[in-house]
């Protein structure tokens, strides 16, 4: 596009110079002076003088762009799987393969995100379950400790009863009660062994003559 514009400007400048030469030699009538026309003529002449410089700079830019494009294509060859005949691929085939490869990567990315979400849900569920089990374990420990405390109190009460000290009167009553129980047991055992009732023990021995 820029090259076409430069060619048009060059043709316009040559036309203006040709008209000027014809006017100087009397081949054509000179137009009345116009300031705008003069400014356009000066501008066109400046563009003609700058045209070679613009063309060279344009060539440099184009060369730089092509070199950068080749570099990008080489980098793309390293990223896209091309197969054994990678040297025979054209730029168009390389771009098509790159497009297919990008779609595969996007599909893999979607699957990976789905798996990641599932794992996060499982992690949250397991975390809540662990918290519930921890609470139940603490409650069970509290229940066991309460039961052991009650058992300890009962055993302490038994020990206190066994180690209780009695006064003289209380000891006599306990002893008499124990003696009465022993006497009743003895009578029962004697009567059972000899075949006589409890009244037989009241008979004294006969007096000797």
Curated annotation (Swiss-Prot):
Keywords: DNA-binding, Nucleus, Repressor, Transcription, Transcription regulation. Residues 140-209 are annotated as: Disordered. Residues 199-209 have a biased composition (Basic residues). It comes from Homo sapiens. This is Max dimerization protein 4. PANTHER family: MAX DIMERIZATION PROTEIN 4, MAX DIMERIZATION, MAD. Its main location: nucleus. Pfam families: HLH. PROSITE patterns: BHLH. SUPFAM superfamilies: HLH, helix-loop-helix DNA-binding domain. Residues 6-23 are annotated as: Interaction with SIN3A and SIN3B.
